[in-house]
Amino acid sequence: MSVIFINDYHLLLVPEMLREKIPDAPIGLFLHATFPSSEIFRCLTTRKEVLQGFLGANLVGFQTYSYARHFIGACTRVLGCESTQTGVNVNGHIVSVGTFPIGIDANRVDQFRKEPAVAPKMKAIRDMYVVARIREILDRLS
């Protein structure tokens, strides 16, 4: 079975909808936006529906630990779910919650850069830009 992965706030209700249609589907949801504290989240009139949408996923991801913590806190305070630092218990089903910061692993990129197979590709790119740089210098001199 394919993994279904949903990205961002426009689609927060989709995991629950999918869960109703495909109960065994592995569903992930990643929120690129901030998740507010439960005190602020409680101000939403549709707070329960939004949280239930999230909880249709098997895995919910956030960019920072504080956003994940806010989400878990909202599930506990608004829906009364039991939770831990890594997940929320929804009627005996655990929804995992994780932190997945977006960024580049500079050490890993540097490691790949040093591999022998990469050297010719790096040279080709450098050579391509040297010609462009020479043209730029000549254009400025004209």
Predicted regions and their residues:
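Catalytic cores of carbohydrate-active enzymes across secretory and cytosolic contexts
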Residues: 1-142
